[in-house]
């Protein structure tokens, strides 16, 4: 029976590791910045779009653009503001409710200015190739308990759904999990809480 080292665990999940060391050891030093750039380059080579996001407003504007493309619909400003505030960044929603929106309730209602209702997909689960994948890095959040800078985030249709903390060779992977747990506690909820979708 294999035994696994527990890297991180919570009431929702457990991450384990099984490591078989390679006989060949690299003597090359790779900084965390170089590791990050290499990782981004690999994602771009697989079809991800690299974009620069410097503020929460940039993140929100990109989200609107991506949802408009996915749904082949252009929001009027009032429609977008209502949809964004009531569905995407609803202040009453926490991480559980936001996860449910992605996993189960990914089709949301938009009440149009003319009173009609239109379905808006957050994610296309029928044809996953309709979803647009983007990668950003070094996004800074200063509205949390502490100022933070996130290494790499993958956006799916503009929503931050995957967050990656990279560690250079020699640093324990556990440090990355601890850092993400700190972010979840101290900053993912900041601003309009978009990082709670991670």
Q: What is each stretch, according to the model?
A:
Residues 1-198:
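An alpha-helical interface "stripe"
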């Amino acid at each position: 029976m294999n035994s696994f080292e527990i890297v991180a665990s919570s009431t929702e999940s457990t991450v384990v590791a099984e490591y078989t060391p390679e006989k060949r050891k690299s003597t090359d030093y790779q900084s965390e910045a170089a590791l990050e750039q290499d990782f981004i380059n690999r994602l771009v080579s697989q079809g991800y779009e690299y974009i620069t996001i410097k503020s929460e407003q940039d993140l929100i504007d990109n989200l609107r653009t991506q949802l408009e493309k996915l749904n082949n619909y252009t929001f009027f400003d009032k429609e977008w503001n209502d949809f964004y505030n009531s569905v995407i960044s609803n202040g009453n929603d926490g991480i559980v409710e936001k996860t449910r929106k992605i996993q189960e309730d990914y089709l949301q209602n938009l009440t149009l200015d003319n009173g009609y209702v239109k379905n808006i997909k957050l994610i296309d689960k029928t044809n996953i190739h309709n979803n647009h994948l983007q990668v950003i890095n070094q996004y800074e959040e200063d509205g949390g308990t502490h100022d933070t800078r996130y290494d790499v985030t993958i956006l799916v249709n503009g929503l931050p759904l995957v967050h990656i903390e990279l560690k250079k060779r020699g640093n324990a992977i556990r440090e990355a999990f601890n850092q993400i747990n700190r972010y979840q506690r101290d900053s993912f909820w900041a601003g309009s809480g978009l990082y709670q979708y991670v």
